[in-house]
């Protein structure tokens, strides 16, 4: 049986393995830092500007909360950026830095 899945969630769950999915806004310094970090490390990512999502941040948070059982999204995370890898929620910029430290120091 098939069911409807939001295009937002499809971007997360359908990304290639090892590809980060980042929801950001251009004017956010934490978003810019996350994008720069991924670029500097030559890590694959797909970036999606939250301003281009119909309903912007409130809609994004609503969808991510609705489908949190699939992605592990924490509904208490309400800041930008919002980052996933391998279909699972990482967090924001600080969480990305911790994730990369663990991944690259083992």
From Swiss-Prot:
Q: Which GO terms describe its cellular component?
A: virion component
Task: Please give the name of this protein.
Answer: Probable glutaredoxin
The cysteines joined by S-S bonds are 28-31
Sequence similarity:
Belongs to the glutaredoxin family.
Q: Does the keyword tRNA-binding apply?
A: no
One family name in Pfam for this protein: Glutaredoxin
Q: What is its main location?
A: virion
The record lists the organism as Acanthamoeba polyphaga mimivirus (APMV)
Keywords tagged on the record: Disulfide bond, Electron transport, Redox-active center, Transport, Virion
- Gene3D superfamilies noted in UniProt: Glutaredoxin
Protein location: Virion
Q: Which residues form the Glutaredoxin domain?
A: 8-106
């Amino acid at each position: 049986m098939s069911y409807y899945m939001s295009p937002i969630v499809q971007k997360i769950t359908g990304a290639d393995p090892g590809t980060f999915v980042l929801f950001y806004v251009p004017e956010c310094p934490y978003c810019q830092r996350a994008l720069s970090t991924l670029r500097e490390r030559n890590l694959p990512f797909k970036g999606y500007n939250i301003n281009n999502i119909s309903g912007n941040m409130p809609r994004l948070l609503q969808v991510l909360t609705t489908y949190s059982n699939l992605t592990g999204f924490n509904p208490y995370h309400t800041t930008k950026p919002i980052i996933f890898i391998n279909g699972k929620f990482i967090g924001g910029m600080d969480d990305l830095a911790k994730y990369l430290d663990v991944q690259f120091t083992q």
